Amino acid sequence: MADYWRKQQPGQPLYGDILWSRPERRDQAGRLTIIGGNSHGFSAVASAYQLARQLGVGEVRAVIPDALGAKLPTAVRHQLDDLILAPSNPSGGLALGAERDLAVAADWSNNLLFIGDNGANAETAKLLERFLTNQAHQGARVTLARDTIDLLVYSAEALLARENCHLVLSLAQLQKLARAVYYPRVITFSQGVKQIAETLHKFTISYQIVITLFHDDNLLVAGEGEV
C-alpha cells in the first residue's frame, strides 16, 4: 500500500485519539450552521439537523429560505431550536440578499454545512459563489454537499483554491470539477479504489481542499495528499 494511503480496519478507529477526546459536555461541543433548502425541499436540512444533534454537536442553527418557512409544519418548527429565515428569490431558493445571514452565521459558528436541496437556481449559485470567495469569510470552515457542488461547478477554480473547504461529493461531481479546471488526470467509473485513491492523493496536493468520496463500497477521505 502506498505511504499516503491509510486504510481503516473493520471495527477499529483509524484515529483513536480523536475518537476518545470528543467533548462529553454539550456546551463544549462547538457550533454548526446548516444551510440549504428551497420552497420545494427541506429533507436534507432536517436530516442533517437531527443527525448533528444525535452526534452531540453543542449548538445547531439552520438557515433556510423564508419561502420555505411558511410551509414548515408546526411539529418540524419545534424540532429546530434555532431557525433563521433568510431572503428567498421567486424560485424559492436563497436570494443574494441572504448573504448577510450567511455572514452572521459564519461569525456565530465558524462551521458551515451547505447541505443542498438548493434547486437549480442561478441566483442561489451566485450567492454561494460570492460568499465562499469573499475574503472576509475565508476563516470559516465550510462543508459543501449534494447539489451545492453542482451549483458551483462553474466557479470550480475559486472553490478549489479556498482554504478550510471540505467537499462531500460523488465520483460524477469530482469528474465535473476536474474537467472544469482542466485537471490532466482521467477519472472514470470503471477505475478501482486504488486508482481513485491515487487520484485523490494527487488532486489534494494540487488543491488545498478536503474531499470525502464513496466509491466501490469504500469511503475515502483525502486532504493534503493523504488518503
Residue spans of the language-model regions?
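Positively charged, low-complexity intrinsically disordered leader regions
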Residues: M1-D27
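Glycine-rich phosphate/dinucleotide-binding loop and adjoining beta-alpha-beta core of small-molecule
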Residues: W5-R6, P65-V227
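Short, contiguous strand/loop micro-motifs
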Residues: P10, I34-G36, V186-I187
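Generic signal for short, ordered secondary-structure residues
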Residues: G11, G30-R31, L152-Y154
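Generic, low-specificity signal for short hydrophobic/alpha-helical stretches with a mild N-terminal bias
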Residues: L14-D17, I34, L113, L159
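Short secondary-structure boundary/capping elements
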Residues: Y15-G16, H40-A44, G93-A98
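Well-ordered alpha-helical segments embedded in enzymatic catalytic cores
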Residues: L19, A44-S47, D101, L127
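Substrate-binding N-lobe of the ribokinase-like
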Residues: S21-P87
